[in-house]
């Protein structure tokens, strides 16, 4: 009964207005009130503040500052094997596995279209058809910065407007095409492991999605698809990120989806739906690598 109520609220509540209100409030400096809200959040969600660079909740001027708190450098060691890719975020695996043609598994009884997820981009869809995917859900208590699974050269970013349904196991099991319907930021990289996409998916109360190269991508929510492109690594204006380096962040919640081309990586056998993830641990192992020189000179 409670689950039905939660799902019903997802359909009838003014999600955009709630999200904008939450984003506004989370960015305000409230002094003692801000500290009280942060303390209540830490208590309710059992957030481990010992991992944070600033464990004292009084040191955060806004709730957003707390939510995107950086961790101590040693809190998340990054796997150094050059043939292994690493998990991009703390959280839990929602689903992972092969992309069956154009279909990605969402939950029992639900798949969604790769092309729909990629906003109808046929060229990008062809890169990842029959490849591999990993969907990672970030719970409220988790660290909400997102990092690189491997070295990468940014080539394309697409902002896709959409719904702002809550993203959690309940909605994944009951709302068809959830990840292809919600607002999202698609980032495509050239890597030694072939093309890779990392998608930051919005949700109700996700005040903003940011990247390290562009700052805040959303809001504003203008309702139109936006696309940016970047040159190869040896050209002026290139964006090159290293394995384990931060690439983006959520100011409140949501989900990261990774896409890999066919025949390039083997996902870690230890990872299954529901597995807890820690940034920097092994995500996948190379099956086929390109030379760094070839990656640097991709057209």
UniProtKB/Swiss-Prot annotation:
Cleavage (non-hydrolytic), annotated site positions: 253-254
Membrane topology: Peripheral membrane protein
Alphabetical UniProt keywords: Cell membrane, Decarboxylase, Lipid biosynthesis, Lipid metabolism, Lyase, Membrane, Phospholipid biosynthesis, Phospholipid metabolism, Pyruvate, Zymogen
Entry's EC annotation: 4.1.1.65
Cofactor: pyruvate
Post-translational modification: Is synthesized initially as an inactive proenzyme. Formation of the active enzyme involves a self-maturation process in which the active site pyruvoyl group is generated from an internal serine residue via an autocatalytic post-translational modification. Two non-identical subunits are generated from the proenzyme in this reaction, and the pyruvate is formed at the N-terminus of the alpha chain, which is derived from the carboxyl end of the proenzyme.
GO MF terms held by the record: phosphatidylserine decarboxylase activity
Cofactor, free-text remark: Binds 1 pyruvoyl group covalently per subunit.
Modified residues (Pyruvic acid (Ser)): 254
GO cellular component, as recorded: plasma membrane
InterPro entries cross-referenced by the UniProt entry: PS_Dcarbxylase, PSD-B, PSD_type1_pro
Reactions catalysed according to its record: a 1,2-diacyl-sn-glycero-3-phospho-L-serine + H(+) = a 1,2-diacyl-sn-glycero-3-phosphoethanolamine + CO2
Pfam families on file: PS_Dcarbxylase
Cell compartment(s), UniProt: Cell membrane
Entry function: Catalyzes the formation of phosphatidylethanolamine (PtdEtn) from phosphatidylserine (PtdSer).
Oligomer and partners: Heterodimer of a large membrane-associated beta subunit and a small pyruvoyl-containing alpha subunit.
Family affiliation: Belongs to the phosphatidylserine decarboxylase family. PSD-B subfamily. Prokaryotic type I sub-subfamily.
Name assigned to this protein: Phosphatidylserine decarboxylase proenzyme
Origin species: Erwinia tasmaniensis (strain DSM 17950 / CFBP 7177 / CIP 109463 / NCPPB 4357 / Et1/99)
Gene name of the record: psd
């Amino acid at each position: 009964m409670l689950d039905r109520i939660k799902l019903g609220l997802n359909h009838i509540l003014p999600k955009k207005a709630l999200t904008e209100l939450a984003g506004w409030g989370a960015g305000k400096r409230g002094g003692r009130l801000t500290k009280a809200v942060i303390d209540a959040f830490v208590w309710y969600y059992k957030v481990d503040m010992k991992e944070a660079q600033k464990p004292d909740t009084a040191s955060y001027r806004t709730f957003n500052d707390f939510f995107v708190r950086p961790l101590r450098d040693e809190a998340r060691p990054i796997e150094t094997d050059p043939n292994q890719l690493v998990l991009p975020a703390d959280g839990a695996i929602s689903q992972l596995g092969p992309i069956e043609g154009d279909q990605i598994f969402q939950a029992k009884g639900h798949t969604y279209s790769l092309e729909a997820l990629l906003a109808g981009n046929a060229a990008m869809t062809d890169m990842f058809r029959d490849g591999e995917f990993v969907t990672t859900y970030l719970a409220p208590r988790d660290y909400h910065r997102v990092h690189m699974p491997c070295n990468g050269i940014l080539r394309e970013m697409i902002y896709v407007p959409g719904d702002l349904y809550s993203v959690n196991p309940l909605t994944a099991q009951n709302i068809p095409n959830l990840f292809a319907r919600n607002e999202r930021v698609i980032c495509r990289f050239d890597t030694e492991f072939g093309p890779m996409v990392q998608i930051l998916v919005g949700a109700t109360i996700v005040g903003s999605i940011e990247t390290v190269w562009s700052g805040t991508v959303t809001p504003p929510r203008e309702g139109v698809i936006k696309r940016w492109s970047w040159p190869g690594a040896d050209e002026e204006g290139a964006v090159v990120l290293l394995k384990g380096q931060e690439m983006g962040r959520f100011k409140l919640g949501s989900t990261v989806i990774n896409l890999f081309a066919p025949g390039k990586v083997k996902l870690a056998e230890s990872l299954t739906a529901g597995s807890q993830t820690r940034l920097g641990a092994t995500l996948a192992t190379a099956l086929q690598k390109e030379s760094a020189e070839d990656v640097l000179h991709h057209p």
